[in-house]
Amino acid sequence: MSISKWPASERPREKLLSMGAPALSDAELLAIFLRIGCVGKSAVDVARELLQQFGGLRPLLEASQKEFCRGRGLGMVKYVQLQAVLEMARRHIHADMKVGDLLSSPHLVRDYLRAQLRHHAREVFAVLFLDNQNRLIAYEELFQGTIDGANVYPREVVKQALAHNAAAVIFAHNHPSGLAEPSQADIRITRRLQEALGLVDIRVLDHLVVGDGELVSLAERGWL
């Protein structure tokens, strides 16, 4: 049955307007994005099939262009639209991070770093450069490596921190394996970076390891 023939309270668009987006299921949200279904199936039916095919909403959102375009009802136009929406969401979070003290909004930092790093197929080491009020100056992905690791050079980190006139930094890197547990190498390089930056009076506030849906803080573990 076409969605237009459903009771108004059950139609995804009307439901969103009356109850808010959080009230919708993943399939209903995806159906709004798809806009139309196909012969014999509503957009919600197609959305449910896609979620089953990809294994959930997050794998669909993080799919490569080639993988995404294999989905029923999807294609290049939808892929471009989705990437634009995701980038707007990232920029919205980035703008929020420039307003206040990041230490008072740890969830914001974590959400931002997950969005930036978890989709990378190779290990990426990134730095948040902060001012003396812990507000974001810049986010930079400084080093990229293989699926097993990235070489990190303290001299380059110090150079970039000074260039941004940063008072503090937060490090982050992803584990493409999906496991966020820090390695001994992660702990060692963090301490080396802390020593190098300490020589120029720049504080290291944390080092976050991003896995598949989880994130570990070295500061919370007492390793800083």
Swiss-Prot record:
Residues annotated as signal peptide: none
GO BP terms: proteolysis
Segments traversing the membrane: none
Amino acids binding Zn(2+): 173, 175, 186
Coiled coil feature spans: none
Domain of life: Bacteria
Any one GO molecular-function label of the UniProt entry: metal ion binding
Residue span(s) of domain MPN: 102-224
CDD domains per UniProt: MPN_DUF2466
Keywords: Hydrolase, Metal-binding, Metalloprotease, Protease, Zinc
InterPro entries (alphabetical): MPN, RadC_JAB, RuvA_2-like, UPF0758, UPF0758_CS, UPF0758_N
Motif (JAMM motif): 173-186
NCBIfam families cross-referenced by the UniProt entry: PRK00024.1, radc
Family: Belongs to the UPF0758 family.
The name this protein goes by in its record: UPF0758 protein CJA_3522
